[in-house]
Regions:
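Short, extreme N-terminal leader segments that mark the start of a protein/domain
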Residues: 1-14, 36
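Short, helix-capping/interhelical loops that line the mouth of catalytic, cofactor-
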Residues: 1-4, 49-107
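Generic alpha-helical structural signal
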Residues: 10, 14-17, 92, 96
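Helix-loop segments that flank and shape redox-cofactor active sites
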Residues: 17-38, 59, 101-107
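Short, structural beta-strand-to-alpha-helix junction motif
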Residues: 38-39, 83
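Histidine-centered divalent metal-coordination motifs
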Residues: 45
């Protein structure tokens, strides 16, 4: 990712934070632009990826040979029982750190 990409990602993260911190309960449940995913699922997807960037889970003993879409589902599934507040908290805890990790790879 280029420095311009990092700058754009920081802007996008800030815009997402602005939106998701003001969501109502009903808005969390609305369909997102991703077919089959709610806004909640989409935020869980982003937060799980940011968490994995900062604090990766241990590698599985056996390789997992799944399509990328199914791998993303596996990251979201454990969060199905989380409250919206827990998903929001995870996003806020890891989003800026994840951008910093990606930025450090450019140095």
């Amino acid at each position: 990712m280029s420095q311009e990409g990092i700058t754009a990602l920081r802007i996008a993260v800030d815009e997402v934070k602005s939106v998701i911190t003001s969501l109502t309960e009903e808005e969390w449940s609305r369909p997102s632009g991703c077919i089959g995913w709610s806004v909640r699922d989409l935020v869980a997807h982003m937060s799980s990826n940011y968490k994995e960037t900062v604090d990766p889970s241990p590698a599985p003993d056996e390789p997992i040979n799944l399509p990328a879409e199914r791998m993303m589902d596996l990251l979201i599934e454990p969060r199905k029982d989380w409250s919206n507040e827990e998903i929001l908290a995870e996003y806020l805890a890891f989003c800026d750190q994840a951008v910093d990790v990606l930025a450090s790879l450019q140095e």
